[in-house]
Design a protein with these regions (language model features):
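Mature-chain termini and adjacent capping regions
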Residues: 1-179
C-alpha cells in the first residue's frame, strides 16, 4: 500500500509538472494568453512591422487595456529603425504601446539613450512616434551630450537623437558640427 501511494504521488507530481510545461511552451504572442494581465520576471516582448522589429521590450507586468498594451515595473525598451538597426534605449517606470499605430509613451523617471552617439534625455514622459520616427516630450527635460547638459521644457528629436531641439531652453549648450 505504501509503495502504491508513493508511485501515485510521483505520477501526479510528474503529470502536473508536464502540464505546466505544455502551458508555457505554446505562448508565442500576447494574444495566446487568456488573461488581461501577464506578470513575469521579466516579460520580454517584441513588436514588429513586417519582418523588422520596431521595439524589444522588457517589463515586470503587461496589461491589455482596450487593445493597447500597458507595461509596468522596470520597463526597458530597445527601439529599432526600418533596417533593424538599434537607434536608442528607453527606460521608464511604465509605458503604453498604442497597437493601432505602434507608437509608444513612456512615463516616470524616463531616460532615453541614443545608440548612435550616447546622448541622454531625462524627463517624466516621452512619446515615440513610430510612423515619423520622432521623439517628443512636452515636459521639463534634461539633455546630456558628452560633458554638456541643457535643461528646458519641450523636446523634439529623431529616434537616434542626431537632430534635436529643446523648445524652451534654460541655459546654453554648444551644438557639434554635424548637428
Amino acid at each position: 500500500m505504501r509503495n502504491f501511494l508513493s508511485n501515485l504521488f510521483l505520477f501526479l507530481l510528474l503529470y502536473s509538472c508536464q502540464e505546466n510545461l505544455d502551458f508555457q511552451k505554446n505562448k508565442e504572442s500576447i494574444y495566446d494568453y487568456n488573461a488581461d494581465e501577464i506578470s513575469g520576471s521579466p516579460i520580454r516582448i517584441s513588436i514588429s512591422e513586417g519582418k523588422a522589429d520596431i521595439y524589444k521590450i522588457v517589463s515586470d507586468t503587461l496589461l491589455d487595456s482596450l487593445g493597447n498594451i500597458l507595461l509596468y515595473g522596470g520597463v526597458g525598451i530597445e527601439v529599432f529603425d526600418q533596417e533593424g538597426k538599434k537607434t536608442n534605449d528607453v527606460f521608464s517606470n511604465r509605458a503604453i504601446v498604442y497597437t493601432q499605430s505602434d507608437s509608444m509613451s513612456a512615463y516616470g523617471n524616463v531616460m532615453a539613450v541614443s545608440a548612435f552617439n550616447g546622448y541622454r534625455l531625462y524627463t517624466e514622459k516621452i512619446i515615440l512616434y513610430n510612423d515619423t520616427k520622432l521623439v517628443k516630450s512636452n515636459n521639463e527635460v534634461l539633455f546630456v551630450r558628452d560633458n554638456d547638459s541643457l535643461r528646458g521644457v519641450g523636446f523634439w528629436s529623431d529616434f537616434d537623437m542626431v537632430h534635436w531641439k529643446i523648445d524652451k531652453p534654460i541655459g546654453l549648450i554648444e551644438k557639434g558640427e554635424n548637428e
